[in-house]
């Protein structure tokens, strides 16, 4: 079992340390998303170390499809495969099965679906998801869950929560078996359960109570940031937070904007991930301490300033807005790389500043100063 140490609190906000076999994670933390064991935009693991990334997130579904989890197992696991010596979290594949896969059919055993790449029929259930993640040898494995569309009818959401709980029990049992095998690469692989229930607070609370009884290594809130208003997301967090174990990390999946993250930390969340910093960067949409910047706007065509004068990332230390904008306009790979590096640097710096504010007992002031500013347009 991993150890989560709660160092300080301010209101519901938490400052902690999460000790794993691949190193200690300082929380709150943002996990950089490398879907296929790489971040799009030409960003290497060397870059990730330089910008302060603590945890990398990779995608079980995509790695199972290509290059195959058995190949990664034969290469010594995901850490050796892409030369990363810090924690890696792999999602269960559930979200992709329910959002990308074609012709899916859900049963109590799992999900039959067609690959979005070649149409090949695939079956994935709790045991298969755990086996794939064990082959990947990630630090943290996510339980296999049903990702229900939002909005969903109450009755369906309730039945789905019950099925997801039964799947979680099977995940826990299968992980215990896999971690005991002599051929398993990471015998200390951790398991996080996922809270579901759409935006129905009674379902969310009941589900969190039930999964908390299983004494897992961490607890995620899933099925949010899928189109519902931000206030509904915050309401769900507030509803389930009292029932999430205090001595375990809380992870809000797929979130989000800097403002979303600040709001969620304020409500007691420790872990975050999102493709937004890299995806937005590839289109010239950048995050700064002054607010959001669209680098492709005409006003930046002759701007000699860096993306942000208060930023220490490689792009801001060396290049102007005008130059990076030019690179994006001519589809030069360097432009996308510099923008991705900037956004990832900003997200990791945001988390470092949040931790510093919690350490110093001034998070409330930090929150008030930046919660609206980060959403403004520069």
How would you name each of these model-derived features?
Residues 1-17, 25-34, 41-42, 145-151, ...:
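C-terminal extensions of enzymes
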Residues 1-185, 298-301:
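Non-catalytic, usually N-terminal nucleic-acid engagement modules in DNA/RNA processing proteins
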Residues 162-165, 174, 178, 186, ...:
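Glycine-rich phosphate/ribose-binding loops and adjacent secondary-structure elements
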Residues 23, 164-171, 211, 240, ...:
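Hydrophobic alpha-helical packing residues
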Residues 23, 56, 91, 133, ...:
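Conserved, mostly hydrophobic/aromatic
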Residues 128, 132, 159-170, 206, ...:
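A non-catalytic, amphipathic alpha-helix used as a structural packing/dimerization or gating element
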Residues 174-184, 248, 354-366:
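Surface-exposed helix-capping loop/turn segments at secondary-structure junctions
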Residues 150-153, 158, 218-224, 333-336:
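Glycine- and acidic
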């Amino acid at each position: 079992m991993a150890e989560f140490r709660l160092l300080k609190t301010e209101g519901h906000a938490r400052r902690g340390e999460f000790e794993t076999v691949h190193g200690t994670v300082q929380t709150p933390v943002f996990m950089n998303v490398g879907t296929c064991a790489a971040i799009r935009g030409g960003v290497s693991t060397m870059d990730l170390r330089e910008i302060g990334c603590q945890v990398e997130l990779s995608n079980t579904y995509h790695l199972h499809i290509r290059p195959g989890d058995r190949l990664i197992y034969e290469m010594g696991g995901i850490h050796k495969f892409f030369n990363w010596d810090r924690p890696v979290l792999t999602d269960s594949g559930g979200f992709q099965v329910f959002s990308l896969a074609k012709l899916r059919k859900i049963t109590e055993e799992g999900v039959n679906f067609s690959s979005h790449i070649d149409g090949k029929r695939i079956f994935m259930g709790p045991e298969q998801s755990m086996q794939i993640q064990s082959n990947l040898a990630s630090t943290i494995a996510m339980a296999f869950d049903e990702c229900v569309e939002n909005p969903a009818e109450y009755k369906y959401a309730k039945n789905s929560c019950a099925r997801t709980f039964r799947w979680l029990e099977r995940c826990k049992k299968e992980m215990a078996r896999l971690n005991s095998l002599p051929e398993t690469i990471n015998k200390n692989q951790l398991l996080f359960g996922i809270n579901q229930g759409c935006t129905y607070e009674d379902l969310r609370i009941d589900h969190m109570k039930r999964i908390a009884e299983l004494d897992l290594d961490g607890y995620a809130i899933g099925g949010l940031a899928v189109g519902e208003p931000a206030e509904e997301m915050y309401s769900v967090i507030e509803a389930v937070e009292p029932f999430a174990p205090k001595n375990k990390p809380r992870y809000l999946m797929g979130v989000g904007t800097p403002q979303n993250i600040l709001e969620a930390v304020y409500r007691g969340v420790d872990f975050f991930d999102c493709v937004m910093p890299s995806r937005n960067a590839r289109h010239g949409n950048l995050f700064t301490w002054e607010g959001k910047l669209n680098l492709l706007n005409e006003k930046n065509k002759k701007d000699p300033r860096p993306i942000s004068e208060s930023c220490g990332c490689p792009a801001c230390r060396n290049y102007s807005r005008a130059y990076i904008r030019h690179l994006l306009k001519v589809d030069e790979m360097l432009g996308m790389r510099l923008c991705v590096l900037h956004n990832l640097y900003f997200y990791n710096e945001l988390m470092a500043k949040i931790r510093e504010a919690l350490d110093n007992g001034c998070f409330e002031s930090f929150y008030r100063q930046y919660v609206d500013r980060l959403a403004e347009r520069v």
